[in-house]
């Protein structure tokens, strides 16, 4: 398969994995291992990255094996998002940041105005910017025009497990994209992840679908395989949909039974 390129980075895996809500560190580590994810994301606000006394996933992981993707979850406006991003960068984690500015506490949908503003500010600061956005086609285009390094439209609300509720909009975003499109939020099953890849997405970021599964380790492996299968299917090219049947066996040379 073709590698996933985000800014200056290249990855074999197209699965980006969140690190929250796992039952314990052991399950988390095993799930990460079997997923073969190379990019791990985490909320900076949920980890005291400057307090050595506070346990966190960075103590348990061989961070040299992964590209860390801090996110700005908890930010309510662009200024807060930029402040969180700078904290992550100051800790030496990474200059790649997932911009997440929530505009509604019930749906956890992103604030489009503040997301645009935060993305522009962080680009000016030299960050590699991956904004979490809705499936708004125009907003995705405006983010792309700013110069973001990837676009991360939600399949459905965060943690909902509803899967892709608006495949048409998602396909429009993918068709117009000149940067990678990473489907983020709402993925509930391997079928959802495969569908995203079959639509032409460049990758999938998920968390709850794995960490909240009855067996997170098995689900992590299932997600890995479904994303690989979906991407291979997209690259191979599906057959055209037709209203009428077409025989799969050749008819030439067949004898006629009278």
Curated annotation (Swiss-Prot):
Q: State the name under which the record lists this protein.
A: Thiazole synthase
What are this entry's molecular-function GO terms? thiazole synthase activity
Q: Name one GO cellular component term.
A: cytoplasm
- Which residues does the Swiss-Prot or TrEMBL record annotate as the active site? 98 (schiff-base intermediate with dxp)
Instruction: List GO BP terms, alphabetically.
Output: thiamine diphosphate biosynthetic process
UniProt keywords, alphabetically: Cytoplasm, Schiff base, Thiamine biosynthesis, Transferase
Domain of life of the organism in this record? Bacteria
| Family annotation (InterPro entries) | Aldolase_TIM, Thiazole_synthase_ThiG, ThiG
